[in-house]
Amino acid sequence: MMLNEMNKSLEGVDIRINEPLKKYTYTKVGGPADFLAFPRNRYELARIVKFANQNNLPWMVLGNASNLIVRDGGIRGFVIMFDKLNAVTVDGYVIEAEAGSNLIETTKVAQYHSLTGFEFACGIPGSIGGAVFMNAGAYGGEISHILISAQVLTRDGEIKTIEARDMRFGYRHSVLQDNQEVVVSAKFSLKPGDYTIISQEMQRLNHLRALKQPLEHPSCGSVFKRPLGHFAGQLIMEAQLMGHRIGGVEVSTKHAGFMVNVANGSAKNYEDLIADVIHRVKENSGVTLEPEVRIIGEKEVQMEDS
């Protein structure tokens, strides 16, 4: 009955039923979404949220799925992906990007227009929406340094503007994590620069990233937040956990702050390995690591042997 109603209310919207999320995540793990939706514009997005709210169905936006782990039991209700909301425009020294825009590609737009300030993000996988939500950063730069404002979707399906000063930015944190609002688009203030110098800096940062990070395997990016006065990777190395493996997921031998899916690992492998590393590092150094990666969805129901 509800499927008929959904087909009528959301006619023309790209919706996939019982769709495995591991097809879309950087980790290559994750169970099915009841309904996976790809809105083409804000009008379709509003229709999806309105339908979900009216039918008491949970909904969430799954950005670019780069810095998160979806559990093997999947996600109930609607999962919304912004892949088709990806327009980027340049007006003077301001770049406006829709939430589904690829972060790395957006830094290339800035480079093409000789605008400086976005170089730090040139190798960070993910979407603009996720980058604002997490206050993504690297090599001394972060989104909070350049954001002007963001248009966000409230849980009621309304769109409003939040100025950068009201984002309550912190280390890998924004107010959006507290109120569960979702970025629809964001404006960034950049400065005029020299194309060659910008290009050289982006090349340098990408070279550093390739040297230090395990880009050859699926991963969820940096797993842990930087603990005060320490480096997570260093603490993990000191606990002799490089190469430590559970199932198909292991602590990278290239950078201990990363976990890589080397042999068809599961979300449970990731979760168990994260918990084990936290426990062992605490035992070894007394420092409690805090995950930077988000873990969402339901655990897989294990069938008991009769």
From Swiss-Prot:
Its cofactor is FAD. Its main location: cytoplasm. InterPro entries: FAD-bd_PCMH (IPR016166), FAD-bd_PCMH-like_sf (IPR036318), FAD-bd_PCMH_sub1 (IPR016167), FAD-bd_PCMH_sub2 (IPR016169), MurB (IPR003170), MurB_C (IPR011601), MurB_C_sf (IPR036635), Oxid_FAD_bind_N (IPR006094). Pfam families: FAD_binding_4, MurB_C. Its EC number is 1.3.1.98. GO terms for molecular function: FAD binding; UDP-N-acetylmuramate dehydrogenase activity. The active site is at R172, S222, E292. The keyword Methyltransferase does not apply. It is found in: Cytoplasm. It catalyses: UDP-N-acetyl-alpha-D-muramate + NADP(+) = UDP-N-acetyl-3-O-(1-carboxyvinyl)-alpha-D-glucosamine + NADPH + H(+). It comes from the Bacteria. Gene3D superfamilies: 3.30.465.10, UDP-N-acetylenolpyruvoylglucosamine reductase, C-terminal domain, Uridine Diphospho-n-acetylenolpyruvylglucosamine Reductase, domain 2. Pathway: Cell wall biogenesis; peptidoglycan biosynthesis. Keywords: Cell cycle, Cell division, Cell shape, Cell wall biogenesis/degradation, Cytoplasm, FAD, Flavoprotein, NADP, Oxidoreductase, Peptidoglycan synthesis. GO terms for biological process: cell division; cell wall organization; peptidoglycan biosynthetic process; regulation of cell shape. One of its GO terms (cellular component) is cytosol. PROSITE patterns: FAD_PCMH. Residues 28-193 form the FAD-binding PCMH-type domain. Cell wall formation. Belongs to the MurB family. This is UDP-N-acetylenolpyruvoylglucosamine reductase. It comes from Streptococcus mutans serotype c (strain ATCC 700610 / UA159).
